Regions:
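Residues in soluble alpha-helical coiled-coils and helical-bundle/repeat scaffolds
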Residues: 20, 113-117, 226
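Glycine-rich, flexible loop/turn motifs
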Residues: 8, 14, 65, 71, ...
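C-terminal substrate-binding subdomain of Rossmann-fold SDR/epimerase-dehydratase oxidoreductases
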Residues: 129-265
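NAD(P)-dependent short-chain dehydrogenase/reductase
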Residues: 52-68, 90-162, 175-177, 184-191
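Conserved donor sugar-nucleotide recognition element shared by glycan-biosynthetic enzymes
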Residues: 80, 88, 118, 180, ...
Length: 265
């Protein structure tokens, strides 16, 4: 199984590691699996599909409809990371068709939960509060992500490994759409702070507007369903984990914030 990925913050100015890890790395793995006739599962991202319009029915959103990504959505990556992930997906598909590689692919929405690197949006804001740093909201905070707890992602991958049809792509999501502004305000509320105690910083370059997953194929064909469907509770549990495991993230914090500061974030 391939879950390879690289943290984005340090690589904005040098995208080559994306190419080497996601393309060359995937090639090495699928060639080894082909040679030794090993079952392979490729973990990918919904970012390969680009982004979707903002929805009218979410607070502060635009004029878009509630469309979602499916396995039939054309690839339209918009960043060095997502373009190389799309390339790695296509390598796997080609090896399945050309060489009979026994493989499946999953494309998942944004994860949250314990052990997530503090560069990422949710743990960054949690550890900012814990470190006495003002949380940072990128741009206006309208960007929407379809959040899924890491335990649900793991259970979905296991379901695909044990029940999935070879050659198929399954999208993993938990119907957890929230905009960044709502998420940061909820974090502050759950941590006993004023929900407006954050500052706006520069938006990310090429920041995709909205991701949303249609996971009906995974649910209907393989019988999977998410267990962590209460985002508020899942976020509270995640906050508690970072509170209780400061030694895991504390040494990284200064470097992460210094790197963000270079980009005005």
């Amino acid at each position: 199984m391939n879950t390879r990925g690289i943290l984005a913050l340090k690589l904005i100015k040098d995208p080559y590691p994306f190419l080497h890890t996601n393309i060359i790395g995937t090639y090495a793995l699928i060639e080894a699996c082909r040679k030794y006739d090993v079952r392979y599962h490729h973990v990918s991202t919904d970012e390969v599909y680009g982004d979707l319009p903002l929805r009218e029915d979410l607070p502060g959103k635009g004029e878009g409809v509630g469309e979602k990504f499916t396995a039939e959505t054309p690839y339209n990556p918009s960043s060095p990371y997502s373009s190389t992930k799309a390339g790695s997906d296509l390598l796997v598909k080609a090896w399945v068709r050309s060489f009979g590689l026994k493989a499946t692919i999953s494309n998942c929405s944004n994860n949250y939960g314990p052990y997530q690197h503090i560069e990422k949006f949710i743990p960054r804001q949690i550890t900012n509060v814990l470190s006495g740093i003002t949380p940072k909201l990128y741009g206006e905070g309208k960007n929407v992500r379809d959040w899924i707890h890491t335990e649900d992602h793991s259970s979905a991958v296991w379901t695909i490994l044990t029940k999935g049809r070879i050659g198929e792509t399954y999208l993993i999501g938990a119907d957890g759409e929230e905009d960044n502004k709502t998420v940061i305000e909820l974090i502050l509320e759950l941590m006993g702070k004023d929900k407006n105690a954050y500052e706006h910083v520069n938006d990310r370059a090429g920041h995709d507007l909205r991701y949303a997953i249609d996971a009906s194929k995974l649910r209907n064909e393989l019988g999977w369903k998410p267990q962590f469907t209460n985002f508020r509770q899942g976020l509270a549990d995640t906050i508690r984990w970072y509170e209780e495991n400061e030694s895991w993230w504390k040494e990284q914090k200064e470097e992460v914030e210094a790197n963000y500061a270079k980009n005005g974030q």
